[in-house]
Design a protein with these regions (language model features):
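Well-ordered alpha-helical segments embedded in enzymatic catalytic cores
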Residues: 11-14, 40, 199, 235-236
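A basic/glycine-biased coupling hinge at the interface between accessory DNA-binding modules
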Residues: 2, 20-21, 42-220, 228, ...
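Conserved RecA-like helicase ATPase core segment
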Residues: 2-7, 33, 37, 43, ...
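Small-residue (primarily alanine) positions within well-ordered alpha-helices
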Residues: 15, 27-29, 56, 63-64
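Hydrophobic residues on short alpha-helical segments
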Residues: 16-17, 140, 237
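N-terminal pre-P-loop "Q-motif" helix
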Residues: 4-20
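Walker A/P-loop
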Residues: 21-39
């Protein structure tokens, strides 16, 4: 028996060795979910799966570093070749590799929250809108919500229910602000943190050739703290249609 399986209970062992089938591990805090995930990756490497074919996504950078250290302790330097990181870091890498396909340059800037808010403030001021109604923080939050729901500016403007709700909230210009905000970001070769996931979805949706490339590369996807993952992140994973 592999040493990697030592100390695991029967259910944990089953989750580790059956790596060719999709698995969802549900258990309480402190029950060893992360240990199962790292053991599964280590076992896959031991069984001959190429590190380059594994994509491990985590909720935080700290979790990614800890997982890599654990796997390294079990199987050695092979762990360093695994594609592992947060959703934002992995998707930023994918976008930089394919930025031109969605109209950006590879060296695009990633806006911090303050950068985004300042741009929104500028747009509101240029349009002579009432800042008591169009509070920059509120507008920024609504733009983030739209992107989290995979709603682009064009789709938002074409959605009668959304624009009708804006009118009832007395912010009928929101769709135009959203559109202009995204236009300015692209003009400045910049994305905000929400764009890293939204634009990855757009890239994989609109470029089947690029999607196919990552389907072939990432043959195994493993997600830590799946319950905390945003819808658009899950959608990006599922769009690859490979082992999860």
């Amino acid at each position: 028996m592999s040493k990697i399986l030592e100390g695991l209970n029967p259910a944990q062992k089953e989750a580790v060795i059956n790596y060719n089938t999709p698995s969802l591990i549900i258990a309480g805090a402190g029950s060893g979910k992360t240990r199962v995930l790292t053991s599964r990756i280590a076992y896959m490497l031991e069984q001959g799966v190429s590190a380059e074919n594994i994509l491990a996504l985590t909720f935080t950078k700290k979790a990614a570093n800890e997982m890599r250290e654990r796997i390294d302790a079990m199987v050695g330097t092979a762990a360093r070749r695994i594609n592992m990181g947060t959703f934002h870091s992995i998707f930023a890498r994918i976008l930089r590799e394919n930025a031109e396909a969605i109209g950006f340059k590879r060296e695009f800037t990633i806006y911090e929250t303050t950068d985004s808010k300042n741009l929104i403030k500028t747009i509101i001021k240029e349009r002579n809108l009432d800042e008591d109604k169009y509070k920059p923080g509120m507008v920024q939050s609504r733009i983030s919500t739209a992107k989290n729901s995979l709603i682009t500016p064009g789709s938002y403007a074409a959605n009668a229910a959304l624009t009708g709700d804006d009118r009832s909230r007395q912010v009928p210009e929101f769709a135009n602000i959203y559109l202009e905000y995204c236009r300015r970001c692209k003009q400045n070769n910049a994305m905000d943190f929400d764009d890293l996931l939204l634009q990855t979805n757009i890239l994989l949706r609109d470029r089947p050739d690029i999607l196919s490339q990552y389907q072939q590369q990432f043959q195994y996807i493993l997600v830590d703290e799946y319950h905390q993952v945003l819808y658009r992140s899950i959608h990006s994973c599922k769009s690859t249609d490979i082992q999860q």
